[in-house]
Every structure is written in structure tokens, then in C-alpha cells.
């Protein structure tokens, strides 16, 4: 009997019967997004919906707009690959519409860098969120086209390790006890990472034996979804990005480990409506506290395909801080800016435009406005905004598709910042430390939108190559300057975050400006054409970073340092 079940398991894994599911979400890391983006560019079409991830029915709809007969041989190969990825769906299909999928992925990664002064995840280009777990066990279930659920179990080291060097939040909070708009409730006990073991060491790996460093934050991906051919409702934990940009989106960016969302989407070939509720953690201490406060980031986006060559996204969004949950505020058709209660709400207006000028040539841009002076309003608060513009050229060569791009991004110092309510999220990671200073929850503060927040000036130029058989690679150069503003710095001239955001400087603010250059190349090669089972891929990333401080008064550079960072890995999926 044991031999029978072993043989049956092998047959199931090697010879799956795939099932299509409309409600299935395609992971944000899937290559299908870059493939369909490239196909749209080659077909003289503006980019498809830039709210990602998509459902299977969305991907099928967007791909159906491509005329494969008009594509070159390389384009048709990419088209067929994307079509297979959509149609494959779940691995096994049974009677009465029941289907399921599952597997296990082993990923062994090695990290090397030359300068141990680059010792936090913020100082690495490929940060903790991008590093793969040693083991990922995942499963998906569907009962017909309309229902889908998925979850994973991870074995990986935590975001904080027992061997890290820690400080206390009392050392980095403002004089009135805040980080951003979050009050620090236990500043004398709650630690933060000053120097990370896994980023400090010159040689490291994702293999570890100290179980005290095990990450309890899983599942990292947990999806409950039901929907049809043109609609979907989901309750999910997954990576998310809203907006087209290689530098980073101003609305919601995918640099975070995950986002918890309740999402409703209606879509067709010409219009997509997204209503997204993103619950935000408000606890900042290391202990297991209760809270009477809650926060939700409420997002609604309207995506219009005005012409085949032009798409426009309009979005109005608000973070709502509440102690009493009032259902009236959830109306997705309301204009959030008219709620007019700054102690409870902070709104962000957003617009995005994508234009296909000709075959292979696209231009695009996004603008976010956090704060602007209205008629009859005082000028006590500073304006807060950001924008990015970019262009792409897509063409076929070397039996694949190249996309060359160049982008510029500028954010004002106080973008995402305000007293009371702001656009910062707090993610707490549980840690089994060996002493009282590191045992419990460790909070990490991040911007929901652009990774580096306000007070930044960034240029990025690069190239992406997608091959239908072997995978894809990317290389780029990024130049950035960052002023004095940070998550830990007060937005108020008196250093009190309970008071209004009134710093009046322009980007880059302060006397000393951080200037950085990044040169990066990364890629992943699939061996599926050589070996159909198990799925094996080899990947790597090499980054060179140069950082210095520029003094605006005396025009001098100081504290120049560099680091070469190398990540190599192999994944085996069964």
C-alpha cells in the first residue's frame, strides 16, 4: 500500500491535469506581468491595468486584446508562453469543479559583500523582503471557476535575529514620543535593529540552524477570493503594487513584505474599478497589547482606456484613524477629501497617464498630492506632493524582447507626513530573543508608497530582457539624492509630531544631502527546457553602491563609502 501511494504521488506531480479558475490570483512575482506589458508595447497599446496582482480572468482579458498574428516570431513566442501560464491554472482537477494545487520549493541563497558598514536591510539593494525562504510549502484550492483560496508555509530566518545589534525606540522617537503619527507606547522596552547579522556578515546564506531566528510571520501569502469573468472580491495577504514605475510607485509600492487587503474589482476591456481596503497595524510596542484605535487605508481607483494608445488612472485615497468604526465612511463612491476631519483622515489624490506613441514607444507618469493649500485655508502646513515621469522603448532581438527605460522621480520633503494620520505603516515581527531586550515583537516602520518617501530626487535608467524559454534579466543605473527628512525625523519645526507638518524647505532639505549611485544587474534562468521536472531555476543579482554626504554650504563631499553586494541562488520546485 505504501508503494502504491508513493507511485500515485509521483504520477500526480509529474503528470498534472491543469484547471482554469477565474478567481485565482497570479502572484506579483510572476513573469506574466512583464510579458504582457511587453506585448502591449509591441502592439502599440498603452499598458494594461497597473494595479497588480491580477486575477486569472483579468490576465486572460488583457491578453485577448493582443493580435498574435501581428507579432514577430519573438513576440508570438512570448504570447504563447503567457497564454500557457494563464491556462495552466491549478495542477489537478477532479469531479464537480473541485481542483487543487500545491508544492514545495527549496531555495538555497548565498550572499557576499565587501563592506560590513552596509549592515542593515535598508543599505542593501536586495533587501530582506526580496530574499527567498529556504523552504516554501504552498497550497491552492478551488471549487469551480468562482472560488479560490491559497496559503503558504515558510521556513526562513526572521527580519530580526538574536545576533543583531539593537537600540531602543526612545533613542529615535521625537521629543513628544512619536515616530511619524504613531505614538510609541513602550519606548524604554521596544527594540529596533541598529545592525543586522544577515546583512553585516561578509558571507551569509539563507540556511540557518539557530531556531531562535525562525520567522513566525507566515503565511506570507494568504488569499481568499471569489469572482467571475468580469469581477472579483478578495480578502488577501500578498505583495501589491498600484502604478507603473521602475523606480517605485507613489500610491502603493511592492517594497513591503506584504499588504493585507480587502479588494473589490470590476473590469472590462475599457474600464477597471478597484476598491481596496488596507487594514494597518497600530501597535508599536514589543508586547502583546490590546488597542482601541484602528487605521484603514481606503483606496479607490478608476482606470480608463480612453483609446487603445491612451490609458488614464484616477484615484482618491485616505487613511482613516478611528476608535468607533462608522460604516458610513466606507462608501467607495464618496469624495474622501470632503470628510473634513484632519484628526481622523489624511487624503491622497493620485493620477497616472500611460501613452503609446508608436509601436514599442511608451511614455507614462504619475502624480500624487498629499497636501495643498485650499482657498480660504491658512498656510500653516507645507505642501506635500510627488511625481514621476518615464519612457520605454520595446523591441525584439536575440529571440526575446528588450525594454529600455528611463525615469525621473521627485518628492517634496513632507510627502506622506502629517500629524494625527500619515501614510506610514508599522509591521511587527515576532522574535524569540534570549534576553528581555529582544524577546517579543519588533516594529519596522515603512512608507506605504515610494520606498524612500519624501525629500528625494531620483533618476533611473535600465534595460529588461525577456526570453520565452530561459527567463529574464535586468540591468540599471540609479542616481539618488535624499534630504534631511526621514521617517524618524519630525515633520514639525519644533520637533513635535503632535503638531502640524510645517517644515517649509524644498527638496533636498537640510545642509547635508545623501547622494547615492547604484549599478545593478540581475537575472533568473529557468532550466525547464532541459528538465521538465522538477522545476529548477538559477538566479543572481550583483549591485555596486556608492554613498556620500554632500554639504550644500561649502560644496564638499564627505563620508564616501562603497559596497559590492552579490546574491546567488538556486530553486527547486516540486
State each model region's role.
Residues 23, 27, 42-50, 54-311, ...:
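Outer-membrane beta-barrel channel domains
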Residues 525, 561-574:
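Outer-membrane beta-barrel "beta-signal"
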Residues 2-10:
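Sec-dependent signal peptide recognition
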Residues 232, 241, 253-441, 454-461, ...:
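Signature for the C-terminal beta-barrel architecture of outer-membrane proteins
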Residues 14-16:
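N-terminal signal peptide c-region/cleavage motif recognized by signal peptidases
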Residues 512-541:
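C-terminal structured "cap/appendage" subdomains that terminate the fold
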Residues 125-128, 164, 200-212, 419, ...:
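Extracellular/periplasm-exposed beta-strand and loop segments of Gram-negative cell-envelope proteins
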Amino acid at each position: 500500500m505504501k508503494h502504491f501511494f508513493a507511485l500515485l504521488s509521483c504520477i500526480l506531480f509529474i503528470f498534472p491535469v491543469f484547471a482554469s479558475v477565474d478567481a485565482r490570483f497570479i502572484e506579483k512575482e510572476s513573469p506574466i506581468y512583464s510579458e504582457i506589458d511587453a506585448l502591449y508595447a509591441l502592439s502599440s497599446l498603452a499598458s494594461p491595468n497597473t494595479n497588480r496582482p491580477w486575477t486569472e480572468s483579468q490576465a486572460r482579458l488583457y491578453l485577448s486584446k493582443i493580435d498574435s498574428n501581428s507579432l514577430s516570431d519573438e513576440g508570438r513566442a512570448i504570447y504563447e508562453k503567457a497564454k500557457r501560464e494563464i491556462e495552466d491554472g491549478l495542477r489537478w482537477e477532479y469531479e464537480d469543479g473541485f481542483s487543487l494545487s500545491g508544492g514545495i520549493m527549496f531555495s538555497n541563497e548565498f550572499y557576499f559583500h565587501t563592506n560590513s558598514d552596509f549592515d542593515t536591510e535598508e543599505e542593501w539593494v536586495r533587501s530582506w523582503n526580496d530574499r527567498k525562504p529556504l523552504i516554501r510549502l504552498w497550497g491552492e484550492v478551488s471549487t469551480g471557476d468562482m472560488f479560490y483560496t491559497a496559503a503558504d508555509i515558510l521556513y526562513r530566518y526572521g527580519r530580526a535575529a538574536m545576533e543583531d545589534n539593537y537600540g531602543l525606540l526612545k533613542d529615535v522617537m521625537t521629543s513628544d514620543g512619536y515616530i511619524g503619527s504613531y505614538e510609541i507606547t513602550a519606548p524604554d522596552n521596544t527594540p529596533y535593529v541598529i545592525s543586522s547579522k544577515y546583512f553585516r556578515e561578509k558571507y551569509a546564506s539563507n540556511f540557518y540552524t539557530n531556531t531562535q531566528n525562525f520567522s513566525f510571520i507566515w503565511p506570507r501569502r494568504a488569499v481568499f477570493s471569489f469572482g467571475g469573468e468580469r469581477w472579483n472580491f478578495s480578502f488577501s495577504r500578498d505583495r501589491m503594487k498600484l502604478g507603473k514605475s521602475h523606480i517605485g510607485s507613489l500610491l502603493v509600492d511592492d517594497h513591503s513584505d506584504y499588504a493585507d487587503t480587502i479588494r473589490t474589482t470590476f473590469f472590462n476591456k475599457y474600464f477597471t474599478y478597484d476598491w481596496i481596503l488596507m487594514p494597518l497595524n497600530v501597535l508599536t510596542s514589543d508586547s502583546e497589547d490590546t488597542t482601541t484605535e484602528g487605521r484603514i487605508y481606503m483606496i479607490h481607483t478608476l482606470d480608463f482606456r480612453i483609446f487603445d494608445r491612451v490609458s488614464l488612472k484616477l484615484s482618491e485615497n485616505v487613511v482613516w484613524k478611528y476608535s468607533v468604526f462608522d460604516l458610513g465612511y466606507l462608501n467607495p463612491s464618496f469624495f474622501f477629501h470632503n470628510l473634513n476631519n484632519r484628526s481622523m483622515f489624511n487624503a491622497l489624490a493620485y493620477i497616472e497617464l500611460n501613452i503609446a506613441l508608436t509601436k514599442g514607444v511608451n511614455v507614462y507618469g504619475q502624480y500624487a498630492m498629499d497636501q495643498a493649500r485650499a482657498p480660504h485655508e491658512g498656510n500653516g502646513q507645507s505642501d506635500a506632493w510627488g511625481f514621476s515621469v518615464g519612457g520605454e522603448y520595446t523591441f525584439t532581438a536575440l529571440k526575446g524582447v528588450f525594454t529600455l527605460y528611463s525615469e525621473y522621480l521627485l518628492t517634496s520633503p513632507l510627502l506622506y507626513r502629517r500629524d494625527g494620520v500619515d501614510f506610514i505603516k508599522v509591521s511587527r515581527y515576532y522574535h524569540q530573543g534570549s534576553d528581555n531586550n529582544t524577546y517579543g515583537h519588533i516594529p519596522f516602520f515603512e512608507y506605504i508608497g515610494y520606498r524612500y518617501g519624501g525629500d528625494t530626487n531620483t533618476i533611473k535608467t535600465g534595460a529588461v530582457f525577456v526570453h520565452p524559454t530561459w527567463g529574464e534579466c535586468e540591468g540599471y543605473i540609479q542616481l539618488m539624492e535624499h534630504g534631511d527628512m526621514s521617517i524618524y525625523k519630525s515633520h514639525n519645526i519644533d520637533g513635535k509630531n503632535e503638531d502640524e507638518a510645517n517644515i517649509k524647505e524644498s527638496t533636498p532639505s537640510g545642509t547635508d544631502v545623501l547622494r547615492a549611485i547604484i549599478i545593478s544587474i540581475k537575472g533568473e534562468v529557468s532550466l525547464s527546457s532541459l528538465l521538465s521536472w522538477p522545476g529548477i531555476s538559477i538566479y543572481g543579482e550583483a549591485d555596486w553602491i556608492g554613498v556620500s554626504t554632500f554639504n550644500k554650504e561649502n560644496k564638499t563631499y564627505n563620508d564616501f563609502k562603497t559596497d559590492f553586494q552579490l546574491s546567488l541562488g538556486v530553486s527547486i520546485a516540486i
